[in-house]
């Protein structure tokens, strides 16, 4: 298996990007057979694919006999942000993986979706690697509950992310912020004034947990357990972070 990474804007690629990266049919080159997209894109700050873009990529895949898979661990956020239906996205790909625990708040659970022959092959591969669980109905019930009850709550997570991003823009220790489309904020720390580790420590002192996301960036993710009444508190705690240049 050979993998070819494609640079995109905040992780989002286009049909032209796919075309430009299809290998020539030469004996000494790996054959291009699969296109994988991530929607929403984690390192792109939760960026979403537009439906028209997906349709164009799908068209290129069909014309070049390529399969299209979507890593949809956070697909629910994309559906809510863009107001698409699951069918809008599902019709554009051969397979898609989804997660029920990230945004939807189920305790555990992911699924892979495809046609009958694909799922049959996936089950065979899972078994070959020792995978499989018994009596998982109770976990499945939690996933169904999450879809039925928590899907529309994702919009609130998106609102919270935008609100805190606006707050962060006012901080002199923030150099830049990726565009906020869903429930994530990825911001770059101004290293002329402070460091990622110092900001993480100061946030932790105020019971705000964040993660380092590369050498200069920090990621914040908003989820089901962050309530509206917590946002003003979060803002005030961030306002308390004052960096004194040594």
Residue ranges and their predicted role:
Residues 1-193, 197-201, 206, 211-217, ...:
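Conserved PLP-enzyme active-site core in the AAT-like
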């Amino acid at each position: 298996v050979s993998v070819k990474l494609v640079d995109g804007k905040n992780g989002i690629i286009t049909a032209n990007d796919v075309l430009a990266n299809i290998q020539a049919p030469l004996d000494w080159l790996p054959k291009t057979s699969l296109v994988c997209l991530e929607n929403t894109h984690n390192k792109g700050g939760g960026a979403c694919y537009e439906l028209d873009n997906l349709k164009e990529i799908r068209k290129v895949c069909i014309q070049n006999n390529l399969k299209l898979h979507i890593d949809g661990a956070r697909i629910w956020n994309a559906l809510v942000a863009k107001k698409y239906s699951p069918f809008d996205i599902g019709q554009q790909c051969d397979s898609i993986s989804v997660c029920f625990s990230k945004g939807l708040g189920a305790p555990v659970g992911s699924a892979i979706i495809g046609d009958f022959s694909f799922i049959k092959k996936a089950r065979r591969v899972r078994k070959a690697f020792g995978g499989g669980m018994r009596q998982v109905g109770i976990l499945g019930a939690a996933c169904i509950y999450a879809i039925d009850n928590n899907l529309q709550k994702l919009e609130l997570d998106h609102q919270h992310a935008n609100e805190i991003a606006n707050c962060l823009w006012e901080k002199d220790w923030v150099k830049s912020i990726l565009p906020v489309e869903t429930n994530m904020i990825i911001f770059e720390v101004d290293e002329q004034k402070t460091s990622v580790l110092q900001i993480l420590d100061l946030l932790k002192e105020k019971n705000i947990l964040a993660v380092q996301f590369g050498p200069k960036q920090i990621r914040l993710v908003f989820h089901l357990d962050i309530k509206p009444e917590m946002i003003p508190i979060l803002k005030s705690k961030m306002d308390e972070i004052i960096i004194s240049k040594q």
